[in-house]
Amino acid sequence: MTAILERRESTSLWGRFCNWITSTENRLYIGWFGVLMIPTLLTATSVFIIAFIAAPPVDIDGIREPVSGSLLYGNNIISGAIIPTSAAIGLHFYPIWEAASVDEWLYNGGPYELIVLHFLLGVACYMGREWELSFRLGMRPWIAVAYSAPVAAATAVFLIYPIGQGSFSDGMPLGISGTFNFMIVFQAEHNILMHPFHMLGVAGVFGGSLFSAMHGSLVTSSLIRETTENESANEGYRFGQEEETYNIVAAHGYFGRLIFQYASFNNSRSLHFFLAAWPVVGIWFTALGISTMAFNLNGFNFNQSVVDSQGRVINTWADIINRANLGMEVMHERNAHNFPLDLAALEVPSLNG
């Protein structure tokens, strides 16, 4: 016993720090990924709050027409946003010390880059921390794999898309209306609604919601009665109990008769894997779609694809969408260019006649 106590006392400060960082007994697990996650997310959150409240207008298009995004400059919670870094900066790394003054840094939208880069580092480390805690506890690694879907989506809109388009000014603004503006412009320029990967993402999100509601309602409807009519059904469950709290056979029988037998899972493990995999794979595909459209590999173009025997166009819904796209495109960044590329003449008229 004496020897053991002596060894503990001789443990270095660094050793004790390592043990504390990797201890699963802490109320909140830190982990080595947490060492980087905590400061980056705190920085991103702090700057976001300050900038959302008080940042001055930003020259997003690089044409000396600042756009207001903060509460103190006339916005509300819905219209407010962190305005993306100016097109004049492009993809340049733009920390505070690269600007001539803090006023210049704010005018060119420096906070957006600061927030986005710290945020992406932070959420990537959060994903690593999920894996790390799973590893320490002897669990399988699929929690971190599932979280990779929103991480991929955030990376696509905040980093990959600006890289492909050549400027952080094309990144998604950090606000409600700014997000909607990003979506509308993205549709106008890339026809995302006609991209199969976006369609898979829609199926993933809506399908995941449907399956979650179906599973929750089936389980809630087939609980094993443990309470009286005067008590909440939730009182019939005790945390850590070994026996099942619902009758999976009854749920399987109900759903199998409602649809057909093989539409219902008879294995709880495969069911829950499916519930996790469906939305995750869908969001993976959407992130991949955003990342390809970043480099202008756009959605399908079926414009004027149906003609009659005289060669006259018979409009389809694809043509209606195209008309809407053109309308959205001519209205955004209206002072940054005279007309969008889609409306430009295919050939320049010859000056020699």
Swiss-Prot record:
This is Photosystem II protein D1. GO terms for biological process: photosynthetic electron transport in photosystem II; response to herbicide. It is a multi-pass membrane protein. The modification N-acetylthreonine is found at T2. A quinone binds at H215, S264, F265. The record marks H190 as: Stabilizes free radical intermediate. PSII is composed of 1 copy each of membrane proteins PsbA, PsbB, PsbC, PsbD, PsbE, PsbF, PsbH, PsbI, PsbJ, PsbK, PsbL, PsbM, PsbT, PsbX, PsbY, PsbZ, Psb30/Ycf12, at least 3 peripheral proteins of the oxygen-evolving complex and a large number of cofactors. It forms dimeric complexes. [CaMn4O5] cluster binds at D170, E189, H332, E333, D342, A344. The chain crosses the membrane at residues 29-46, 118-133, 142-156, 197-218, 274-288. It catalyses: 2 a plastoquinone + 4 hnu + 2 H2O = 2 a plastoquinol + O2. It comes from Oryza sativa subsp. japonica.
